């Protein structure tokens, strides 16, 4: 497999990673949402009553911290450019570097705004209390997401309207695609 162009999207829950992924899809770029790939495995292999976050930790303990990235790589196909939405740790970046040239984009939003978004989003595995959301943030940070955000090539600030975020994202994508 020759080297491909990889866009690694990272950010805390509710930061706007999905909105950036949507823009990339609109440009015809294949986006693989890492949590969807993980959920696929979770529904097949999770223990009775096991939370998705606990399943993710267990998978990484069994197969290494880059385990979810390896599962995602299998879904690339023949694409020359692909985006991975939801990179959680540096080991995943290292897996992606084995097959492509990686550009990391971190999406950042203030916690209060992210919590509001997550409460509105209502995804099945989203917790519905501020305390639960704060706990999830710490679990993400323990997984290593802070290192990926800190070492990102670009940081998109998402603290205003969706229109303003899309405009900033479009400008960035023009430069890197």
Curated annotation (Swiss-Prot):
The keyword Magnesium does not apply. It comes from the Archaea. Keywords: ATP-binding, Nucleotide-binding. The lineage of its organism: Archaea, Thermoproteota, Thermoprotei, Sulfolobales, Sulfolobaceae. InterPro entries: NTP_hydrolase-rel (IPR022970), P-loop_NTPase (IPR027417). SUPFAM superfamilies: P-loop containing nucleoside triphosphate hydrolases. ATP binds at residues 11-18. This is UPF0200 protein STK_09500. The keyword Nucleotide-binding applies. GO terms for molecular function: ATP binding. Belongs to the UPF0200 family. Gene3D superfamilies: P-loop containing nucleotide triphosphate hydrolases (3.40.50.300).
């Amino acid at each position: 497999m020759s080297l491909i162009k990889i866009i690694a999207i990272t950010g805390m829950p509710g930061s706007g990673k999905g909105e950036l992924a949507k823009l990339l899809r609109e440009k015809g770029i294949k986006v693989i949402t890492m949590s969807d790939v993980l959920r696929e495995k979770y529904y097949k292999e999770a223990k009775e009553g096991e939370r998705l976050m606990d399943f993710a930790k267990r998978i990484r303990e069994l197969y290494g911290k880059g385990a979810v990235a390896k599962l995602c790589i299998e879904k690339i196909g023949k694409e020359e450019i692909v985006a991975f939405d939801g990179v959680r740790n540096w080991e995943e970046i290292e897996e992606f570097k084995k097959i492509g040239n990686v550009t990391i984009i971190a999406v950042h939003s203030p916690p209060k705004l992210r919590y509001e978004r997550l409460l509105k989003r209502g995804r099945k595995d989203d917790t519905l209390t501020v305390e639960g959301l704060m706990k999830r943030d710490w679990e993400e940070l323990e997984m290593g997401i802070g290192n990926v955000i800190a070492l990102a090539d670009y940081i998109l600030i998402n603290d205003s309207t969706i229109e303003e975020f899309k405009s900033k994202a479009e400008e960035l994508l023009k430069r890197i695609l």
